[in-house]
């Protein structure tokens, strides 16, 4: 949140902050910023849709409905702003690794990003462009969303999710079993 707030001091900074908000709230790959659309269910519920299809050795990922996971309840009204054409984004090139590279280059010149990277490095952790996407996975699991649902929301298979987004630790395993035991006592 501090990083996003720090960027919002200029028009260009606002556009980049909007991109980071989308990456974080919807768990997007950077390139997916160029493939967003608003759609509507038959019952009239509007949602953000990603038409991107990632090619891999396992085939193509499917376009998908995006599920927001706000940070501390803050969703920045991204869907309504996007639909109204009021969510300005930087000009992004979807060629190759262009979007991720553009975001990386922009952030590497920002003092808030440099400071945040140093704090993360002091904990022997890494901070990169995909950290916004990774935080989506962590928030989802902490909220009790199962791995299969998180994988589907993020546009990859359960196998990929489990290998690339290992969430389970001794602490999370203990919490999961504590919750299960508490549920069985209630029912």
Where are these regions (language model features)?
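Catalytic-site neighborhood detector that most strongly recognizes the C-terminal catalytic loop/helix
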Residues: 52-56, 154-179
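Active-site/catalytic core of tyrosine-dependent DNA strand-transfer enzymes
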Residues: 68-132, 136
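C-terminal catalytic core of tyrosine-transesterase DNA break-rejoin enzymes
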Residues: 21, 25, 32, 130-156
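Short, polar N-cap/turn motifs at the start of nucleic acid-interacting alpha helices
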Residues: 39-47, 145-164
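Extended hydrophobic-aromatic, low-complexity segments
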Residues: 59-61, 78-81, 130, 147-152, ...
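Conserved tyrosine-mediated DNA breakage-rejoining catalytic core shared by Y-recombinases
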Residues: 35-77
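Basic, Lys/Arg- and aromatic-enriched nucleic-acid-binding interface segment
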Residues: 1-30, 34
